[in-house]
């Protein structure tokens, strides 16, 4: 039958291929609803599918700025028998409730708050390498990024020093700039969320080791930031 594939902006091609490929292999047709922030990749995929000989109507794409309205159409249409969604927990809950009305199958890959844990007996260099990879991939905008780093007391200061040295050495620039390590956030809302998390943490006692402000590279750039003294009362301890 028909599969509705609702995909996020942070990996606009990979998420489509992961959802569409198994659906096609199972003999289903697909309606892709890409993020309103990155619709062009989805349209390009559909165009390439047509060029490759995919029959008309097998892969379809619906774009638009009113994501809730499009979601309601997909979840209420009885011809759609499965919904697959990658995105926020809040939206996932809404789609789950809506899909229940017609008892659709549903697959949800939702947000989280992943910890990166460093114990006293850890290999310091390996721990720093791992933290850099886990935290700053795609400017930290992935669902599997380390949202918080928990470091045992005995290695804490050494880790902070080594990690901060690596963070401050990163080049913040447009991804097309040679040697760029960290690019922009997806939009103004994304930048504002980072600012709010940092401000909330500082107001509740956290300390800035480096960063903590927007970056001169542009309005959507935020300086790579290291905070210490973070506790569970702060928003960044529980929000993605």
Model-identified regions with their sequence ranges:
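Rossmann-like NAD(P) dinucleotide-binding subdomain of oxidoreductase/dehydrogenase enzymes
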Residues: 1-126
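ALDH superfamily catalytic-core signature
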Residues: 82, 90-235
């Amino acid at each position: 039958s028909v599969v509705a594939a609702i995909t996020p902006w942070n990996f606009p091609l990979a998420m489509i291929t992961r959802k569409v490929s198994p659906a096609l292999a199972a003999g289903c047709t697909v309606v892709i609803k890409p993020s309103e922030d990155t619709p062009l990749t989805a349209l390009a995929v559909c165009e390439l599918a047509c060029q490759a000989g995919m029959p008309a109507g097998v892969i379809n794409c619906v774009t638009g700025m009113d994501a809730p309205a499009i979601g309601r159409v997909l979840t209420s249409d009885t011809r759609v028998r499965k919904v697959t969604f990658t995105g926020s927990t809040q939206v996932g809950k809404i789609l789950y409730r809506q899909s229940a009305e017609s008892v659709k199958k549903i697959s949800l890959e939702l947000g989280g708050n992943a910890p990166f844990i460093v114990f006293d007996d850890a290999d310091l260099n390996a721990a720093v390498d791992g933290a850099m990879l886990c935290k700053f991939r795609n400017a930290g905008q992935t669902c599997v990024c380390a949202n918080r780093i928990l470091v045992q007391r005995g290695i804490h200061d050494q880790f902070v020093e080594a990690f901060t040295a690596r963070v401050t050495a990163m080049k913040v620039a447009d991804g097309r700039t040679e040697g760029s390590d960290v690019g922009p956030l997806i939009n103004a809302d994304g930048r504002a969320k980072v600012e709010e998390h940092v401000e909330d943490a500082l107001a509740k006692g956290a300390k800035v080791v480096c960063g903590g402000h927007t970056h001169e590279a542009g309005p959507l750039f935020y300086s790579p930031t290291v905070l210490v003294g973070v506790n569970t009362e702060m928003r960044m301890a529980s929000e993605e």
